[in-house]
Amino acid sequence: MVAIPDSSQDLLSIDEAISELATIRDFLRWSVSLFNEHQLVLGHGFDDPWDEAVALVLHALHLPWDTDVRIQDARVLPAERKVICSLLARRVLERVPTAYLTGVGWFAGIPFQVDQRVLIPRSPIGELIEKQFAPWIDPAAVESILDLCTGSGCIGIACAQYFPDALVDCADLSEDALDVAERNVLDLGFEQQVNVIYSDLFEALDGRTYDIIVSNPPYVDKQDMDALADEFHHEPRMGLEAGNDGLDIVRKMLPELSRHLNP
């Protein structure tokens, strides 16, 4: 686990450094250096510290992520510096992932609302969804999809985006997670296509069957869970840990799959 630096000393150094910065470009460059210096763990929606710095700084300035790069030479106001300082302190000193600080996690090209009730979207399933599971699936033949352990709803909603003629059920055992999923369904305009269900895997599905079943279930074993970097410990443990070998949920799921999958 990454050692947390002394908060009082480092917060002071962050505050002092920011007082010397003038433009958005200055803040981006310095944020990347800060992330590298403190060896922040990436992997919660960002592949490199530059992209993460852009997301954090632009969020603090109430600017969209795709703002024209020419604005990077604009000066940052004193009040804005304080907001950036506060966010950087939480990211560096507390190791809070950026997606939780901005409230947005991207998946399959879609922005999802996220908070610490759900995992931050990052499953490689997203690439398969964007390709409509080619070459294994005929997209035109897909009428129903189930997303088990849906969390934020990102996988199920992404399926709805890329299979517009399919009805999608998103199931989870966490009521907190389902609240977030429901909000994403409504905010993204999928309420006519996506249904959010409280269910322990298949238990509340009343024998329904589907053309596609997708899932990113908890898969981390107990030993690895305890050794994960601090960033991961801001996420709900229920969404990550799956027993001594990481397969508790998978073992429970597999015997039921064939009964709910259309031929």
Where in the sequence are the language-model features?
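Charged catalytic carboxylate motif
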Residues: 27-30, 52, 83-84, 124, ...
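SAM-dependent Rossmann-like transferase core, predominantly class I methyltransferases
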Residues: 71-72, 76, 82-164, 171-183
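Active-site/binding-pocket entry motifs
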Residues: 62-63, 118-119, 219
